[in-house]
Curated annotation (Swiss-Prot):
Any one GO BP annotation for this protein: protein ubiquitination
Phenotype of the disrupted gene, per the record: Heterozygotes fail to form cohesive and stratified epithelium in their optic vesicles. Average somite angle is increased by 30% and the posterior central nervous system displays a gain of Rohon-Beard sensory neurons. Defects are the result of decreased Hh/shh-signaling demonstrated by the reduced expression of the Hh/shh target gene ptch2.
Cysteines engaged in disulfide bonds, as pairs: none
Pfam family, one: zf-UBR
Function, in words: E3 ubiquitin-protein ligase which is a component of the N-end rule pathway. Recognizes and binds to proteins bearing specific N-terminal residues, leading to their ubiquitination and subsequent degradation. Positively regulates hedgehog/shh-signaling pathways that function in eye development, neuronal specification and somite development. Activation of shh up-regulates transcription of ubr3, which in turn promotes hedgehog/shh signaling possibly by controlling negative regulators such as Kif7.
Species: Danio rerio
Keywords, comma-separated and alphabetical: Metal-binding, Transferase, Ubl conjugation pathway, Zinc, Zinc-finger
Domain of life: Eukaryota
Protein name per Swiss-Prot or TrEMBL: E3 ubiquitin-protein ligase ubr3
Coiled-coil portions: none
């Protein structure tokens, strides 16, 4: 009842009243009232209504306003942490210098307020969300705190008054339980309801949760209250059950209980089925229990019977596999259903159930700065961990959910204290490992490796969603995160049962993703599961391994290593048993995944390297070693097979696997441990056994015979060579790689860096990426640590970013120093690290280029031999590989085969053989000091070599060898021939016969048999009898292919060579000289000189080493060299061999021919490119240069680039220039000042567009149109500053009819990108420059030569009259058809048709708004204005391109490519259509003093524009264009003179306005005094005086702004400064006239100094013929008046005076125009990109107020636009495109804020230009992925600006695409 009355009163007073009640000591009535009120307000059945929230706010505030309350609470904030929580895509910072945990991150504010100068930091876009760690000493060093969190704020904050938060403590528990009840009620199991129901519930709750979030942001005081409520178990008990009478609450509670039921890892029913096995004592029962707990498939029954069988099999596997490990799940409670004791736990529970809604996550995280809360929350999180992962596996949105989970867990587990705490108290490690196992068990399948039928091993199935979508990563990343803490990792390593569990987890990945080689047809479906497999091994196995390894660095941790190694071996043994492995790997199977082997290898390596363990103590017996060796060796052989195209039928993915295996992110967790493991095996097993295993695995055993022919049962002959090369290369890598065998970390880093740099020059970031770093972030080899930088500067030189003339931009690159090539280039390391085989070639090419350049060696060098770092003593056994007979026999055989030119040998084979010999010579075995004598009879090859030392075996001569050859082999035939020659049997002395007999017994050699024998020997060391019973030679029988090969027969070959003699003979063969090594050679050899070179050098180096190390060898060598005999040619070459040799030779010759042709072609192409392509270079082909001066009066000939004919342009078949028309606003963006405008980066800065050239001209025109006659206005100014049409050409010409057919062919060709043929676009057929129109060339002579140039002697007045007459003849066009507007009956020639069509193109180039400035659009006046403005635009732009003046003379590139001459004629022809009414012809007003016309003004509604207001260059262009062509030069000069006087007068007027009143008076007096002197019309003083006195008549022209002007011109005007001002004012007009004269008459433009420009131009234009002294040129001296100057000036002034009705300041502003403009510039950008980024990436869009997803900036005007934003779309066109049309007439240059790159929009196309911001290493950072600080690269920005001004975007940038208005 009372509640109702309370509800009726206003909220404020109620709240105040209740608060007063509750403050009393006896507050029971207050409590009761509050409870009742809350019952009715917060009744959850009413749903969420805003009213309830409102009540809560008032109640919390207890009578104050809520905002006020917030402020008060904030003032008590005692938090020392920032704790700002952000969501995905937020921009945060990470500083590695300050971080203790690798996950440390800072918000932008804390980062910018801290001092991180010189630190290793980067900016990043958050993937999953995060929180700011500023102030948290567990995660980062205090030095990095920002100045706000550096002070321990807690100490000086007053304690909170009790009553402030009293109401909060009362109200909030009820508020929270309301939310919880709502969540309970809304929840339905996802199976039954659609996900969107959950979304709906969340939407309705949104305001409530937002309110909670708001509260958390109030600071420490409020957080404490919330923590208390959330963790208080008593309140939870009271409120959670629901009161008995409340049905709604009860119903909820039941829903909640049912939801809880399914929260265990295993649901209740399954548990029932397992029958409480958890309590069972017997091992089996416990196993079954654990099995059911682990959610195995035991209880799952499937309908499908076939599935069921499969399942049964699996279940058996599962049980047998897991009985061992089940008992170690210590605490079954991990798996049980959850029980909740406080609000926090239930809130988290619902957060999980609803799949982590963002708001809830943020609320829970916002509370973390509260320490008590942090601990409780972490425990709660761990308690729910299993449940979270279970939910994740079922979720449909696993990606978003993963991100949210990691968002939370990374905040909790990065803190070592917390992690240790929950590991100890809540068994975090057990939970994680168990959950991981549980996860993976959902996707196990039977392994098919080795014994497919009886294999008992299970592996994960990489095709399952769990692996394919990386669903496991949140779990694994948490696991890696906690293992990075030493205390946690030690616990893990000490807990043996956990380790065992972990090993069984790792074994799920052992042998996954098995490949079977396809032998018959190509595989139908290429599965891409391999990437999931590699990712899984790297993330789930390798990274935790690296994490553990970082804690095994010191002697004290030896035991950990021993334990891990022991368990690895046990698990491996179990694995071998499970897959049924005996001793031979099964054929044609390959898996790249052996994580158990790799764990074993890495812990071995660590133990030996860091913990001083003895290797032998960690190794198993020989038999186990042999087993361990098999699979890694299989991978190495298969790599070779894949590169030999033997797996080609398995599709591309198998190549992908081979590449991923060695790729930089994987190699140190995959190939490196594999090779290390093989090195360990090789150092401990019998070397003969190991070597023969290698050749057998590589399938090249059959090739290793002395016979010239053989049969290989397993390889095609074209695969033999690559496989042999592979086997030898592998042996070389095995013997020479030292990564785990004794190199220090620095040496490894250096070697890695050198090998990457040798392949290619690299950017800093790609180098960081390519150097395999220890994947665990805490490992200390942090990329970018100082040692990386030091190392880099040690081995490489930095090449600054440069530009190529084509405009493609280079990044800053590092390139190896010369001494690196000389001493450190290691081809073996390069081969090991290359993903693509072509990189090896690239490294060799670069190496040989270096040798050529430094003059060391000019030929084709061989890979250099590199000395190795010494072996760690533990691995000395590896050297025995190089000193075993088997290897020596192989080497001997191969040397012999190469010398005899047997097939399938190659240079690479020889190279590797020599490498092995040299390795052997450099690594002697220590034990045998005495050279062994063959004292013991060995079974098989005692007579090949006496001992095992390579040195002594080198000179051992082998006489006879017995070989098995096919009957067809040449050896057999040779023997038959011999027998035919001597019918008698060989009569030799008996001893030699026995000798031969002896040989026949011995010299047979079978690798396979040898290997079997050794294997047997090792296995049966104990019983001798068994060693006799060698297994039957299964290999031979098993490998025989079907079909009947020719019979094998045994033959004896006579050899009589030793390895030394073979080397000498090979030397002779390579050098093609008979006695290439003289006796004296040995004496003078110096091995150091032989470091670089080809095969000869290598052989010489080896021989030198051999003779230096053994006297015996030296003697033998001298004998051999002494005997020097011609190399024994192979006796008879069988025709087959001959053919193959010829073939080789022919191929070689063909290759040489091809090289020659290619070189010739390249040089031709280069010379063409230089002449035709180079856009910038002025030396273009003179042929195409249309404006080149012709000495003769002949017609100009043009070359057509399509049909190749040369001829004049005629009326019927006109020729045209290839041109590109584009609208341009570059001129309109010019400003007065030379300094570019700055880009605003704060709210205070702005850019004002009013002062640009375009804006000024617009204002001027509209001002005129207000007061003067429209048609006259349209002739008084030029338009085209914005959106003017610019015409440029590449200088090539073509027949217009040829062009049309060319366009047709393009139309049918669909492949052209970025060119729309419908719009007339094409590329020039010769130089491929982009173009879109053809400008017809006028028939006739090139330049007006001869008579037209004769200097004129006529007087000025005659010329003026002639010009006037010429203007009268408008209609007469000097072509055969006279064209008049009103005369339609005309024959149009082809030429005029083309001209019309070009005019149409020109009009279509720009937008309508840039053409219609008149009152009535489309009128002839308007058209007339547009046409002459096109000429003006092109002249002005050429001036800009020449640097704004003509000082540089005629050599400018612009002139060469200029088409102004042609353009002028086309425009002139078009303008001839309009006649200027002679009554209004400005010429008369310029040259006659006509007083008669004043009275005519009265009938006009508006006056014409006074002469002084008109734009002089416009008049010039109008006159020239409307007079008949060709114009005599004298007439041109006359027009210029007349207009110059007008320009000069305007200059005086503009100047006089700037004077103060006193100055005006003074100057007018001076002028009056000089007026009567002779030549006064050529002195500016008199003219100025006259002008001032005339203009003073006008009503207040001068009085308008006298105050401001006087302020402006505080400096006094001296005569010099006035003269300078006048010259500057006239210069723009003179420049344009001069340029026009240059194009029309071909006059050259001499260069000069800037100071002399005025005098030079006046001389060129013939204004200053009389005045010769160039020194002090007076501007007035150039005037030539045809009538009295003073009269004319008075008349012009009177026109202004007559404008009585115009307001005076307008007249003044029209008079005071200034024609000078600075060059166009882009905005000035700040040096540091961060300045732009921080201001703009958060700036909101002006139209919708939200922060745009892709903000962009216009670099021309600074506008802030949304790229692709839908908010700013107009008629389907997005904002960037719109802005480009508005600001740049369809050219836009935009900087994309979030990507730091610039895009160019040109019309309907766009392209990515690149970035002008580079990091410290000269690299772009597109999309800010690396987030390193970026700095403005001035050169690049200049290039961008230059391309903009020169309009060359279309030519220089190649990759254009259509934007469909979507940008």
């Amino acid at each position: 009842m009372m509640a109702a009355s309370l509800l009726r009163r206003d909220k404020k007073s109620t709240a105040a009243h209740l608060k007063a009640d509750l403050k009393r000591t006896d507050n029971s009535s207050g409590l009761r009232q509050l409870q009742e009120l809350l019952d009715s307000v917060l009744n959850p059945e009413r749903g969420s209504d805003p009213e309830a929230l409102d009540w809560c706010k008032w109640l919390l505030a207890g009578g104050d306003g809520f905002d006020e309350f917030c402020r008060t609470v904030r003032s008590y904030d005692n938090a020392t942490l920032c704790g700002l929580v952000w969501t995905a895509n937020f921009v945060a910072y990470r500083c590695r210098t300050c971080g203790i945990s690798p996950c440390m991150s800072l918000c932008a504010e804390c980062f910018n307020n801290g001092d991180h100068t010189g630190h290793d930091f980067n900016m990043f876009r958050s993937q999953a969300g995060g929180a700011c760690d500023c102030g948290d000493g567990n995660v980062m060093r205090e030095s990095g705190f920002c100045n706000r969190h550096r002070l321990k704020t807690g100490e000086n904050v007053p304690s909170v008054p009790r009553d402030l938060l009293l109401m909060s403590e009362m109200v909030l528990p009820r508020f929270i339980i309301t939310i919880i009840q709502y969540l309970r009620d809304g929840y339905t199991e996802p199976e039954s309801a659609a996900d969107r129901d959950l979304q709906k519930v969340l939407q309705q709750l949104d305001p409530h949760i937002s309110f909670l979030e708001e509260l958390t942001k109030m600071g420490g005081a409020m957080r404490t209250v919330l923590t208390k409520i959330l963790t208080d178990q008593q309140t939870f008990k009271e409120l959670s059950m629901g009161q008995e009478d409340n049905v709604y609450a009860k119903k909820n509670y039941e829903k909640y209980l049912s939801a809880l039921k399914s929260s265990g890892l295993v649901s209740v029913e399954e548990k029932g089925a397992a029958g409480g096995a958890g309590d069972g004592t017997s091992d089996a029962a416990a196993g079954a229990g654990a099995l059911s707990l682990l959610g195995a498939t035991a209880t799952a029954s499937l309908d499908d019977s076939s599935k069921e069988e499969d399942q049964d099999g699996l279940q058996g596997v599962g049980q047998r596999k897991r009985v061992k490990l089940s008992s170690s799940t210590k605490d079954p409670s991990i798996m049980d259903t959850l029980k909740h004791k406080c609000f926090l736990e239930e809130l988290l529970f619902w957060t999980i159930k609803y799949e982590f809604p963002q708001k809830m996550v943020t609320f829970l995280l916002n509370m973390l700065p509260d320490q008590d809360y942090k601990i409780t929350f972490t425990k709660t999180f761990v308690q729910h961990y299993a449940f979270i992962m279970k939910t994740l596996m079922k979720s449909h949105e696993s990606d978003t959910m993963s991100n949210r989970i990691v968002h939370i867990s990374v905040q909790l587990f990065s803190n070592e204290e917390l992690a240790r705490h929950v590991t100890e108290e809540c068994q975090l490690l057990d939970i994680m490992v168990t959950v991981l196992l549980y996860m993976m068990e959902s996707c196990l399948i039977k392994s098919e490796l080795q014994d497919e039928e009886n294999n008992r091993h299970v592996v994960v199935n990489c095709g399952e969603a769990l692996l394919k979508n990386n669903t496991y990563w949140p779990l694994v990343s948490d696991f890696i995160n906690i293992l990075s803490h030493q205390s946690v990792a030690k616990r893990f390593l000490e807990d043996h049962s956990l380790l065992l569990l972990w090993m069984s987890f790792v074994s799920f990945f052992q042998g996954m993703n098995l490949n079977k080689r396809e032998l018959n047809e190509h595989v139908e479906f290429e599965s891409q599961t391999y990437y999931a497999a590699f990712a899984a091994e790297l993330e789930a196995c390798a990274q935790p391994m690296w994490g553990l390894l970082t804690h095994c660095k010191v002697k004290e941790t030896q035991d950990y290593t021993k334990t891990v190694v022991r368990y690895c071996l046990e698990t491996l043994q179990m694995w071998f048993d499970a897959i049924g492995f005996v001793d031979e790997p099964s054929l044609n199977q390959l898996t790249f995944h052996l994580p158990l082997h790799r764990y074993y290898a890495m812990f071995l390596s660590k133990g030996v390297k860091c913990q001083g363990l003895d290797l032998d103590s960690l190794l198993p017996d020989q038999e186990m070693l042999m087993k361990i060796m098999v699979h890694p060796l299989q991978i190495q052989a298969s790599l070779s097979e894949i590169h030999s195209n033997m797996w080609v039928r398995n599709g591309l993915q198998i190549k992908g696997q081979a590449m991923t295996y060695v790729q930089s992110h994987f190699c140190n967790s995959m190939i490196d441990p594999d090779i290390y493991l093989l090195q360990v095996c090789a150092s401990r097993l019998d070397p003969d056994y190991f070597i023969s295993s290698v050749f057998e695995r590589f399938k090249v055993v059959d090739l290793l015979t002395m016979a010239s022919q053989h049969q290989n049962a397993v390889l095609d002959s074209e695969q033999e060579r690559p496989m042999l090369e592979g086997a030898l290369t592998f042996l070389v890598i095995l013997c020479s790689l030292r990564i785990h065998l004794g190199m220090s970390d620095d040496e490894i880093l250096r070697a890695e860096m050198v090998s990457q740099l040798c392949m290619n020059d690299r950017t800093h970031s790609s180098l960081l990426d390519l150097i395999p770093e220890n994947p665990n972030p805490k490992s200390g080899v942090v990329p970018g640590s100082c040692s990386f930088e030091e190392m880099l500067s040690g081995v490489a030189d930095f090449k600054a970013p440069v530009f190529e003339p084509g405009g493609s931009m280079q990044q800053g690159m590092y390139t190896p120093k010369a001494e690196v090539w000389e001493k450190e280039f290691d081809p073996i390391m390069v081969i090991l690290r290359t993903v693509y085989r072509r990189d090896v070639q690239s490294a060799m090419d670069r190496y040989s280029a270096f040798l050529k350049q430094s003059g060391v060696h000019t030929g084709n060098p061989w890979p250099p031999y590199k000395e190795r770092t010494p072996l760690h003593p533990c691995y000395k056994g590896l050297v025995r590989l190089l000193h075993c007979k088997t290897l020596h026999i192989v080497i001997f055989t191969l040397l012999y085969k190469i010398w005899m030119d047997h097939q399938n040998m190659s240079e690479h084979v020889l190279c590797m053989v020599l490498y092995l010999i040299e390795l052997g010579l450099d690594n002697q075995v220590q034990d045998d000091k005495v050279e062994e004598e063959p004292c013991i009879e060995e079974h098989c090859h005692d007579s090949w070599f006496p001992g095992t030392s390579l040195l002594s075996n080198l000179h051992h001569v082998i006489n006879f060898v017995r070989v098995r050859v096919p009957e067809t082999a040449p050896e057999v035939e040779r023997k038959r021939e011999r027998e035919r020659e001597r019918e008698t049997p060989p009569s030799t002395s008996s001893e030699s016969a026995t000798f031969g007999q002896n040989l026949r017994e011995a010299q047979v050699f079978s690798l396979v048999a040898e290997r079997r024998r050794k294997f047997q020997e090792i296995i049966n060391r104990s019983n001798h009898e068994a060693s006799q019973a060698v297994r039957p030679k299964s290999s031979a029988s098993r490998w025989l292919p079907p079909g009947t090969p020719p019979q094998l027969v045994t033959e004896i070959l006579e050899i009589r060579e030793s390895m030394l003699s073979l080397l000498v003979k090979l030397h002779q063969k390579l050098s093609a000289k008979q006695n290439s090594l003289s006796l004296s050679w040995l004496a003078e050899v110096d091995p150091a000189h032989h470091a670089h070179g080809d095969g000869l050098t290598a052989i010489e180096r080896i021989l030198a080493k051999a003779s230096a190390r053994s006297r015996h060898s030296k003697r033998c060598l001298q004998e051999i060299c002494g005997k020097v005999c011609p190399p024994i040619p192979p006796k008879k070459i069988s025709p087959g061999d001959k053919k193959s040799m010829d073939k080789e030779e022919r191929r070689q010759r063909a290759r040489e021919r091809q090289q020659k042709l290619l070189a010739e072609f390249a040089s031709r192409q280069k010379s063409f490119m230089e002449t035709a392509m180079d856009v910038e270079s002025p030396e273009a082909d003179a042929v195409m240069d249309v404006s080149s001066e012709e000495s003769l009066d002949s017609e100009v000939l043009y070359d057509c680039v399509i049909c190749g004919q040369s001829g004049p342009s005629t009326e019927d078949r006109p020729t045209g220039l290839v041109v590109l028309l584009q609208a341009s606003s570059v001129l309109g963006h010019r400003c007065r000042s030379d300094m570019p405008k700055r880009l605003p980066t704060t709210d205070e800065e702005h850019i004002y567009p009013e002062d640009t050239c375009g804006a000024t001209h617009d204002v001027r025109l509209s001002l005129m149109q207000r007061y003067f006659k429209d048609s006259s206005c349209l002739q008084s100014v030029s338009i085209g500053w914005d959106g003017g049409v610019y015409v440029q050409t590449c200088g090539h010409t073509l027949h217009i009819d040829c062009h049309k057919s060319y366009m047709e062919s393009l139309r049918n060709d669909q492949v052209l990108q970025g060119i729309s043929v419908d719009k007339g676009e094409f590329t020039c057929p010769l130089c491929r420059q982009f173009a879109n129109s053809v400008l017809p060339c006028r028939p006739g002579r090139g330049m007006e030569t001869g008579a037209w140039h004769a200097p004129s002697t006529k007087s000025m007045s005659t010329l003026v009259k002639e010009v006037e007459d010429l203007q009268e003849q408008l209609g007469i066009f000097p072509v055969r058809a006279s064209i008049k507007q009103r005369d339609p009956i005309l024959i149009e020639s082809n030429l005029s048709k083309e001209m019309e069509s070009v005019i149409k193109d020109i009009k279509n180039t720009t937008q309508k708004k840039y053409m219609d400035y008149g009152k009535n659009p489309g009128s002839p006046d308007n058209d007339f204005l547009f046409m002459y403005s096109v000429a003006r635009t092109n002249l002005e732009l050429e001036l800009v391109h020449r640097g704004g003046n003509l000082c540089s003379g005629g050599a400018s590139a612009a002139a060469k490519r200029s088409c102004l001459n042609q353009l002028f004629h086309v425009l002139a022809m078009h303008m001839r259509l309009y006649s200027i009414d002679s009554a209004y012809n400005p010429w008369t007003r310029l040259t006659l003093s006509t007083q008669s016309r004043e009275n005519e003004y009265c009938d006009e509604e508006r006056p014409e524009v006074p002469m002084l207001f008109r734009d002089v260059p416009s008049l010039l262009i109008i006159f020239i264009l409307t007079m008949p062509q060709p114009l005599r030069k004298e007439h041109f000069t006359c027009v210029v003179k007349v207009l110059y006087s007008l320009q000069f007068t305007q200059a005086l007027a503009a100047l006089s306005i700037r004077f103060s009143r006193e100055e005006r008076l003074a100057w007018s007096n001076t002028g009056a005094a000089k007026k009567n002197l002779p030549n006064s019309d050529k002195s500016w003083e008199s003219l100025l005086g006259h002008m001032i006195s005339e203009l003073t008549k006008a009503k207040d022209v001068y009085d308008t702004n006298s105050e401001e002007t006087s302020a402006l011109s505080s400096s006094v005007w001296s005569p010099q400064s006035i003269e300078f001002r006048l010259q500057q004012f006239c210069l723009p007009f003179l420049r344009l006239s001069c340029l026009l004269q240059h194009h029309l008459y071909g006059d050259s433009l001499p260069g000069c100094l800037v100071e002399e420009e005025f005098s030079l131009l006046t001389r060129c234009l013939g204004l200053a013929a009389s005045v010769q002294c160039s020194g002090s040129m007076s501007s007035a001296a150039c005037l030539e008046w045809n009538i009295s100057a003073f009269d004319l000036i008075s008349q012009w002034c009177s026109e202004v005076v007559a404008l009585s009705d115009t307001p005076s300041q307008q007249s003044a502003s029209l008079l005071g125009q200034d024609p000078q403009w600075a060059a166009p510039r882009l905005l000035q950008l700040p040096d540091n990109y961060n300045t732009i980024f921080q201001y703009y990436h958060r700036k909101s869009c002006s139209s919708c107020g939200k922060t745009p997803k892709d903000p962009a900036l216009c670099l021309v005007c600074g506008a802030f636009v949304c790229l692709k934003g839908h908010c700013c779309k107009q008629q389907g066109v997005c904002e960037c495109v719109l802005h480009s049309q508005h600001c740049g007439a369809a050219t836009g240059i935009f900087l994309l804020i979030n990507a730091s790159v610039i895009i160019i929009i040109r019309g309907h196309r766009f392209c990515l230009w690149g970035s002008v911001y580079l990091d410290a290493h000269g690299e772009e950072d597109r999309d800010l992925r690396r987030g390193k600080p970026l700095y403005l690269c001035e050169e690049r920005y200049r290039v961008l600006e230059q391309q903009w001004v020169a309009h060359t975007f279309d030519h220089i940038n190649k990759r254009w695409g259509p934007h469909y208005n979507g940008l």
